[in-house]
From Swiss-Prot:
<dbReference type="GO" id="GO:0005524">
    <property type="term" value="F:ATP binding"/>
</dbReference>
<keyword id="KW-0093">Biotin biosynthesis</keyword>
<keyword id="KW-0067">ATP-binding</keyword>
<dbReference type="Pfam" id="PF13500">
    <property type="entry name" value="AAA_26"/>
</dbReference>
<comment type="subunit">
    <text>Homodimer.</text>
</comment>
<feature type="binding site">
    <location>
        <position position="18"/>
    </location>
    <ligand>
        <name>Mg(2+)</name>
    </ligand>
</feature>
<feature type="binding site">
    <location>
        <begin position="177"/>
        <end position="178"/>
    </location>
    <ligand>
        <name>ATP</name>
    </ligand>
</feature>
<feature type="binding site">
    <location>
        <begin position="117"/>
        <end position="120"/>
    </location>
    <ligand>
        <name>ATP</name>
    </ligand>
</feature>
<protein>
    <recommendedName>
        <fullName>ATP-dependent dethiobiotin synthetase BioD</fullName>
        <ecNumber>6.3.3.3</ecNumber>
    </recommendedName>
</protein>
<keyword id="KW-0547">Nucleotide-binding</keyword>
<comment type="function">
    <text>Catalyzes a mechanistically unusual reaction, the ATP-dependent insertion of CO2 between the N7 and N8 nitrogen atoms of 7,8-diaminopelargonic acid (DAPA, also called 7,8-diammoniononanoate) to form a ureido ring.</text>
</comment>
<keyword id="KW-0963">Cytoplasm</keyword>
<feature type="binding site">
    <location>
        <position position="43"/>
    </location>
    <ligand>
        <name>substrate</name>
    </ligand>
</feature>
<comment type="similarity">
    <text>Belongs to the dethiobiotin synthetase family.</text>
</comment>
<dbReference type="GO" id="GO:0000287">
    <property type="term" value="F:magnesium ion binding"/>
</dbReference>
<keyword id="KW-0436">Ligase</keyword>
<dbReference type="GO" id="GO:0005829">
    <property type="term" value="C:cytosol"/>
</dbReference>
Length: 224
């Protein structure tokens, strides 16, 4: 696999980063590699007998092979469904890069590929002191951009790609995720995205509200 680890970000919140990340995990596994997901910081967690768990992080865990320990996959599990900075403050947690570095190293030792899913859109901060760019830079990861295909997506995608580049980081690919079945001229929009984003398209995930991640993996085009 050309990229043994990468960071999945999005053009906004709720545009399908987890859908894309789980599809990526299954696509990597279909090539015969072991692959695990990571959700460094997750808010909106629910209480379980095993502790606070997040729906997206659980989806990443289910798509992983081998399946990592939840606390390693999601080191910061925050109860409130808020921006991480606010959710962490609510429970008196101070986010630090060190636990994330340690967890990532453990996951790298467990599998050939690690898919790290970010929070919200690229510019969403992790804390008052940390941006996602700080984490990505520390872990030395390239970035894959998930574009939620809806009205305004070309602007959002170009701004996000420019922000990633301005942070001195490398965006190695983008994925079109169709999230609005009523969108007009969707083919033209995806064509325009391809013309304006200076990185290869890693796939186009169609609108399938009840599809399983393993089935969506067929729509991912991993680089050789």
């Amino acid at each position: 696999m050309q990229f043994p680890a990468f960071y999945v970000t999005g053009t906004d919140t709720g545009i399908g980063k987890t859908v894309a990340s789980t599809a990526l995990l299954h696509a990597v596994r279909a090539r015969g590699h072991t692959a695990v997901g990571m959700k460094p910081v997750a808010s909106g967690c629910v209480a379980t007998p095993q502790g606070w768990h997040n729906e997206d992080a659980l989806a990443l865990q289910a798509a992983s092979q081998p399946q990592p320990d939840y606390a390693t996959l999601n080191p910061y599990a925050l109860p409130a469904a808020l921006a991480p900075e606010l959710a962490a403050a609510d429970v008196g947690v101070s986010l630090s890069l060190v636990p994330l570095q340690l967890a990532f190293a453990q996951l790298r030792a467990q599998a050939e590929v690690v898919v790290v899913e970010g929070v919200g859109g690229w510019a969403a901060p992790l804390s008052a002191q940390l941006d996602q760019a700080d984490l990505v830079r520390t872990l030395q990861l390239p970035v894959v951009l998930v574009v939620g295909v809806r009205l305004g997506c070309i602007n959002h995608a170009r701004l996000t790609a420019a922000a990633i580049a301005a942070d001195g980081l490398r965006c190695i690919g983008w994925i079109a995720n169709e999230i609005d079945p009523q969108m007009e001229r969707i083919e033209d929009n995806i064509r325009m995205l391809g013309q304006r984003l200076a990185m290869p398209c890693w796939g186009r995930i169609p609108w399938r509200p009840n599809a399983q991640a393993e089935g969506l993996a067929q729509h991912i085009r991993l680089p050789e």
